[in-house]
Amino acid sequence: VTNAIKIFAQVAMVQRRGAMISKKLCAGLLVLVTPQLVGAQTMFSTNDMVYKGAIRVPIGTYGDSRMGYAQGPFEVMDDESSSFMVGHTKDQAVAEFSLPPFSLAKEISELPMAQNKQPFVTVFDRIPDGNPQGINRITGLLFIEERLIVNGIEYYDAAADNTDTTFFIQDASQLGSSSVSGFRKLEARVHVSGWMTEVPQELYGLFEKEYIFGYANNTPINSRHSIGPSAFGVGLASIINSNPGDEIPTTSLIDYSLANPLAEDSNNETGENNLWTEESRAFLGFIVPGTETYAVFGTSGGHNSGVGYKITQDDGTVCPGFCPYKASDIYNYYWLYDINDMISVFQGKMLPHDVRPYEYGELLLPFQDQGGKPKLIIGADFNPATSTVFFMLGKADTLQSNYEAAPLLIAYRISLRGEGAGSESPPGAPSSVDVQ
């Protein structure tokens, strides 16, 4: 692992930038936000990410689960002293781990280890009214007012008819004994039942909502999914004041479907789809504070070799579903959207499926290259209190066991260039992010 990460970008082929367009967008913002905010705006690029370091997560069994084969969702507390994490995929249990300071050490063996603070507890079996729709995958965690808000889906909802999405662990400080309250029903269903991130306070008025919820076609049955990363506005009061069985209103800002996907040619048969394929996944979307950008992070694949269904890959692997023809043709990826497009959708001037990212591309992370296939992001979180984005890199720590690998937690601080410099034009293709 070097002391820098290189990020290769594809700037989307959308003719939207230039001084005249930027001035028009800024003029539109003047109506919606305070003048001092407009003066502070810029377009985020991955060049604005400064590596803070990494930590290890112990692989031992704590209570009902362990971090081997971790599902991926996690929630870092504002003071970054601890994080709630979902354990082994088969268990769907939640634990809390104390976090040490992140380290810039270049060897995994030299990284500090998190410590278990609250053991894993299963949650789906503790919902008082049961789980009639068979929700069996945790897809998002959010800490609000001592509660842990949990989004979930049924992994294989063949009928695409599930409406249950959300439940509460009422006292996150007592995972084992807390009451559990659910299910609520997000209006947009699985299109929105993934990440949950706070809108920067100065932008609350833009969408009249305090939170962005989103998801993508990360699991089977595309007919129920947004075929590309979504963004929906959700009000804080509608979340915390809801009762089991209530529908929580959602406002569509970015959303796709089978009829209107983010990208055509999902198997990349033409060899020209470098935006979104059947192998693309999104794990986090958030509005970057101080910018006009909605940033999405996840993984993608098949942009070079194409994607097949139940094929045999070049390394002999027989795939149970979709996969790239070349086994190593997978990568960590990002997509950056202009929130002015989201404003246009909110105002009825644009359709949610017409929104396209202004920049997207491959993201090379520390410790991802260890020979063979790259280690991929399985979860991500953003802490607005410290402007830090966290990535959980799956199966990256192979030192703890000969039989299963643990994830690593990696952190980047967002440090904007020049406090507004660049608001007249989009960022160019980024080249590197220095370790500081």
Language-model regions, residue ranges each:
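A short helix->beta-strand "capping" segment at the edge of beta-propeller domains
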Residues: 41-66, 353-371
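Beta-strand-rich domains and repeat architectures in extracellular enzymes and scaffolds
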Residues: 53-89
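Structural signature of eukaryotic scaffold interfaces centered on beta-propeller domains
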Residues: 66-80, 126-149, 154-158, 187-212, ...
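Blade-loop segments of beta-propeller domains
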Residues: 95-140
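Beta-propeller blade signature
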Residues: 96-110, 160-183, 224-246, 313-343, ...
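Loop/turn-rich, solvent-exposed surfaces of beta-rich toroidal or solenoidal domains
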Residues: 272-370, 380
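Blade-level signature of beta-propeller repeat domains, shared across WD40, Kelch, NHL, RCC1
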Residues: 376-420
